[in-house]
Amino acid sequence: MKKYCFILLACIVAVSCGEKTPREGVSLQLANQRKAFISNIEYNLYFRIPENRQESLRGRVDIGFISSKKANVILDFRASEDMIGDVIMDGNRVEYRFINGHILIPGKYISVGENCITLEFTPCDGSLNRSDEFLYTLLVPDRASTVFPCFDQPDMKAVFALTLDIPESWKAVTNGMDETCQPQTEGEKRMVFKATQPISTYLFAFAAGKFETVSQTHHERTLTMFHRETDKEKLERNTDVLFQLHYGALQWLKEYTGIPYPFGKLDFVLIPGFQYSGMEHPGAIFYNDSRLMLDKNPSVNERLNQANLIAHEVSHQWFGNLVTMQWFNDV
């Protein structure tokens, strides 16, 4: 009997230690633990993006949330500890522990009700996909935490507001609508974007760089295409088709689901060398440019693939973005 009591005690201690010392990644245990007492999450993000890709980005995030109890709060940040700057609550620096890619804020700093944690950090370059003239994020399925501290699990949706300081000749796009654009220091400008509706961390995205834009308005909705295409004939040949396919998909899905497009604005970005055919970020779909900018006299299959890709990514705005799976195994 003593033997079994000892084993039971050891298991309890192990579980307790597991909660206090999170392992690498986001375990289902950690995800369920956070989801049970944290809600109403808001990320107010700021990044400064230097034109020289040899210079690191600087970042800051205000994470607002409601806590139903005083408990340790564990954020995900898959970087090294020296990439974390100040951690501030109520105007004061707070002590924290950095464990296996997590930032643990002790429960003594957490209030029942509203909380706000401000963190300064340096993002990892891996998920920023930087080149000399542009960069873009790709955070699926669980890579948001390589760019900024967050609760990186799909069922903890949050509101995102973004501010970017970028070179003055660059353009930028994200999930939310652009609100203001003001000159900053010499050679830079600040773009402030409106807050999104609640979305999962893997769906947050932005792109910035030397892009050109084309906009069209149909059915009282304006779509904007960001691109880097230099072949004017190819651009002219494909542009109207791409807009028609997006508008057609939006209209069909609205009629099919009975739900209007749920995310306000919708832009799409054609990116050279993008890793996937497309990625369905709400408000800012990213595509591999070669899949949509077709050469002269495309085959029937190429046209069908072009239309299928757009329909696929637009359908995700309802199936995946509006209604989202609970866990990573369904991403």
Where does each model-flagged region fall?
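Hydrophobic helix-coil surface modules that form long, contiguous segments used
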Residues: 59, 153-311, 330
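A surface-exposed beta-strand-loop module
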Residues: 78-135, 185-186
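Surface-exposed beta-strand/loop patches in extracellular or lumenal glycoproteins
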Residues: 60-81, 152, 159-167
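Surface-exposed, acidic/Ser/Thr-rich flexible loop segments
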Residues: 108-171
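Hydrophobic h-region of N-terminal signal peptides that target proteins for export
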Residues: 10-17
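Catalytic Zn2+-binding segment of zinc metalloproteases
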Residues: 314-329
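Positively charged n-region of N-terminal signal peptides that target proteins for export
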Residues: 1-4
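N-terminal, polar/Ser/Thr-rich
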Residues: 17-58, 85, 129-133, 154
